[in-house]
A protein has these predicted regions:
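Helix-start (N-cap) detector for alpha-helical repeat units in TPR-like alpha-solenoids
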Residues: 11-13, 46-47, 80-81, 114-115, ...
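Canonical tetratricopeptide repeat
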Residues: 17, 51, 85, 119, ...
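Register position in tetratricopeptide repeats
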Residues: 24-25, 58, 92, 126-129, ...
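Canonical positions in the second alpha-helix
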Residues: 37-38, 71-72, 105-106, 139-140, ...
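Short coil turns that delineate tetratricopeptide repeat
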Residues: 43, 77, 111, 144-147, ...
């Protein structure tokens, strides 16, 4: 109350200055008191509403901030910065379509704002506005180069994989790669996108180029081996897995991958041994490993052990194990 009484003695400009300085210090309550006075003194001044809205954003009172920004825009629809501020408030309250409209309005006036392009790229991904996403992704790469891929590439890949749109993403990254064919970051991102889009043949073509310069990259070798496996080029896949195991002989997932190759080659004893090592080392897909080991043991004439493995596989969620149980383990 005391500050409110004193504040009334100051000019509009002084109240605004007090409010902004208090905001900078993190003293939001004092800032609001001062800016309330400024709004009351000159309610037709949009900047007072904008400034109070910004303080409310800092206070995480986003709903009240939107009210202030709405009033400011009503008073002065030509102050571009207000749309960016309201975008932030809308985004935080999950009013994504309104936020999208505001960030588009802002970038229509301030086209070179890198922060705003990053924000819109992220939001357009959330809204599956892929044309806008592409526009911002390409623009940002032209400005910040490989940092765009390194910072946001994994997030983008996860989004498209989750939404089963990997072919769309592969197409977008492919277009970017055509523009910047010398970029290793784009090429590696394109490899990942093609792999997740199940476009294994072109993925292998790019892997050949990348591995010639970077032969010891474990992630690239894994993509290569997996792509060969999915193309049913089992012997080639097995050779790559075997080579990788020389450097990481206890890698549970590599052991599982190699074991499944041995299974496809009908090397039952070796597959049994390899998958047993993988299960013992706790691979990330135990249900599939138990299924495979059960098949290897069945083909060695070890039906009892095979049935135990298939039962375990089915319990862990591998539906394909049910077929083997029904066909060979009816007593189970």
């Amino acid at each position: 109350m005391y500050f409110s009484q004193i504040a009334a003695q100051y000019s509009f400009e002084q109240l605004m200055s007090f409010g902004m300085r208090s905001d900078e210090k993190g003293d939001y309550a004092t800032a609001i008191v001062s800016l309330d006075q400024a709004v009351e003194m000159k309610p037709q001044e949009d900047i007072a509403w904008v400034t109070r809205g910004v303080v409310r954003v800092h206070m995480r009172d986003f709903g009240s901030a939107v009210v202030d920004f709405n009033k400011a825009i009503l008073l002065n629809p030509n102050r571009t910065q207000t749309y960016l501020y309201r975008y932030i408030a809308y985004r935080e309250t999950e009013n994504f379509q309104f936020a999208y409209s505001d960030i588009n309005r802002y970038l229509g006036e301030v086209a070179e704002d890198t922060f705003a392009h990053i924000q819109r790229m992220d939001l357009s991904l959330l809204l599956s506005e892929y044309e806008t996403f592409q526009t911002d992704m390409f623009w940002l790469y032209s400005k910040i180069g490989d940092a765009m891929i390194l910072e946001y590439g994994q997030q983008h890949l996860q989004h498209f994989e989750k939404n089963k749109q990997c072919k769309t993403y592969a197409n977008l990254v492919g277009q970017l790669y055509q523009m910047y064919p010398e970029s290793k970051s784009i090429r590696q991102q394109y490899i990942a996108a093609l792999f997740h889009a199940e476009q294994y043949a072109p993925c292998l073509d790019l892997l050949k180029i990348e591995l010639s310069d970077n032969p010891n990259n474990v992630n690239l070798r894994k993509y290569q081996a997996d792509a060969l496996f999915f193309l049913n080029r089992i012997e080639e896949a097995a050779n790559v897995y075997a080579q990788m195991l020389k450097s990481a002989p206890n890698d549970a997932d590599l052991l599982a991958d190699y074991g499944h190759c041995l299974l496809q080659q009908e090397k039952w004893v070796e597959a049994d041994e390899c998958l047993s090592k993988s299960i013992k080392a706790k691979n990330s897909s135990p249900a599939y490993a138990y299924l495979g080991r059960g098949i290897a043991r069945y083909n060695q004439g070890k039906l009892g052990l095979a049935c135990v493995d298939w039962e375990r596989s089915y319990q862990l969620g591998e539906k394909a194990a049910k077929k083997w149980l029904d066909a060979h383990c009816k007593e189970k």
